[in-house]
Amino acid sequence: MAMTIDVQVVSAEGSIYSGAADMVVAPGEMGELGILPRHAPLLTGLRPGELRIIHGAETEYLFVNGGVLEIQPHLVTVLADSAERATDIDEAKAMAAKQAAEARMAGQADRMEYAAAQAELLEQIARLKTVQRLREQGLLR
């Protein structure tokens, strides 16, 4: 019997994913993390990006907008600021939000407003990269 790891992905909206996986790939703050069963315990922040949950030949693609990742030897818990299935991303809306953030950054002298616009820009770029990756793999048209 193959060894698996339980995965829970939750956000303020509720549970996004719950199930077993052979491997999880998460967008950690310092880079991507590959998590297998029996991984050493770890607690780290997440940056906006693609979360991949691999089970056999199937891969579930989610988009997380930051949060916290807790790893135990037999359990991965993602407490996301927000999360959605990657196939549910509205590409046109993400592109419009990216352009709006760029415009806000261009005309902003206030550091706090600039930082907020920059965070929004990074989120939308990560969303668009996720859509592009799914399209390249033939999972989106």
Explain the meaning of each model-derived region.
Residues A83-R141:
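Acidic/glycine-rich phosphate/pyrophosphate-binding loops and surrounding catalytic core
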Residues M1-Y61:
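A positional/architectural concept
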Residues E13, E32, E70, E84, ...:
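Acidic-residue sensor for enzyme active/binding pockets
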